[in-house]
């Protein structure tokens, strides 16, 4: 989800800067402008960027906890990182794959009809991204694991600690 979201965003951004279609809203008699100047395209691109960067940040945080849990000396820091990682895995997996798919969908929207054609990579990105929400336990199964098991670990203290960290 993370890599495809970022790739889809970069492709859509480049296309929106290059593709000219329609005049600006401020002057309907003007020549066609790059579609990045149209409000709906800009809104889609901003949403795509936010989701792409959000998935990257969340994944980086999980990677940090993975590194600490694997390489720190045994002790509280290592245990805390392992606990955080255990809790974050289903969250990162579901969020990244769901938002990655949404970014790919929005990229197709930015491309318009061309986005649905195989000549442009966003069509393939969307198909590739969808399978990531199914592999390694569907996102629904991951959610059940989070709610049914991981949020209850250590009497719920692990989850509440994570919530406090986010606040």
Walk through the language-model features, giving the residues of each.
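Flavin-dependent oxidoreductase catalytic core characteristic
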Residues: 1-167
């Amino acid at each position: 989800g993370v890599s495809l979201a970022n790739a889809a965003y970069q492709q859509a951004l480049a296309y929106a800067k290059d593709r000219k279609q329609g005049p600006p809203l401020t002057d309907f008699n003007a020549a066609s402008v790059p579609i990045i100047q149209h409000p709906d395209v800009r809104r889609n691109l901003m949403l795509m960027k936010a989701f792409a960067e959000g998935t990257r940040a969340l994944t980086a945080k999980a990677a940090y906890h993975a590194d600490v849990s694997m390489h720190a000396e045994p002790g509280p820091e290592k245990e805390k990182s392992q606990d955080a990682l255990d809790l974050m895995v289903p969250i990162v997996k579901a969020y990244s794959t769901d938002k990655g798919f949404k970014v790919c969908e929005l990229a197709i929207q930015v491309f318009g009809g061309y986005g649905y054609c195989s000549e442009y990579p966003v069509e393939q990105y969307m198909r590739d991204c969808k399978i990531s929400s199914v592999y390694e336990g569907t996102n629904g199964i991951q959610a059940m694991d989070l709610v049914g098991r991981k949020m209850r670990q250590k009497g719920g203290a692990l989850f509440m600690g994570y919530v406090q960290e986010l606040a």
